Amino acid sequence: IIPDIKIKGALVQLGDLKINRDNWDNKFIDENPFWCPDRDSIKSWKKKINSLIDEGDSCGAVIEIIAKNVPVGLGAPIYGKLDSDLGSAIMSINAVKGFEIGNGFDAASLKGSENSDEMRIKNNKPTFISNNSGGILGGISSGQDIIVRFAVKPTSSIRKERKTIDKSQNETAISTTGRHDPCVGIR
């Protein structure tokens, strides 16, 4: 739609294993099976996946998407908010159970003075000092990078036996055989 916009996604958390953001390398994302930006995380992530396969279990994941060169003014302050539209689209993806923009849920533990995005004039233009809002203020794009993250649940279709009931309400157990995704967030 807008040719200058560049969108890139990466897996930033596999189960309880998070990347080290200081090691972020955009080029490395396409070079590994996890779409991970942190080269140092790969060994532990492989070990985690192999362990889950052996156990017949699964884990969740967090994916981060960054959109660069988004123009100022997309969205609306009341109806048609950009953050609402993005949330609706992302939450429509199977297995997604959480969505955040910018500081997201971490903002709940911050003060307003810590979370707000202050501005200054740089090269005769208004410039943000931070991007805690993830590039969206009041439902409208601010011109900064739009940063969103979403959480994908662990799949319940696992080999590991789980308690359930049958159609006659008898207690029983279930185990899924065949294809087993240890983490659907990698897909």
Predicted regions and their residues:
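Buried hydrophobic packing segments
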Residues: 1, 148-149, 187
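Glycine-rich, mobile lid/loop segments that gate access to catalytic sites or pores
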Residues: 1-78
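Glycine-rich anion/phosphate-binding loop at the beta-strand->alpha-helix junction
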Residues: 56-59, 63-171
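A structural-propensity feature for long, helix-poor, extended segments
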Residues: 9, 18-22, 28-32, 39-40, ...
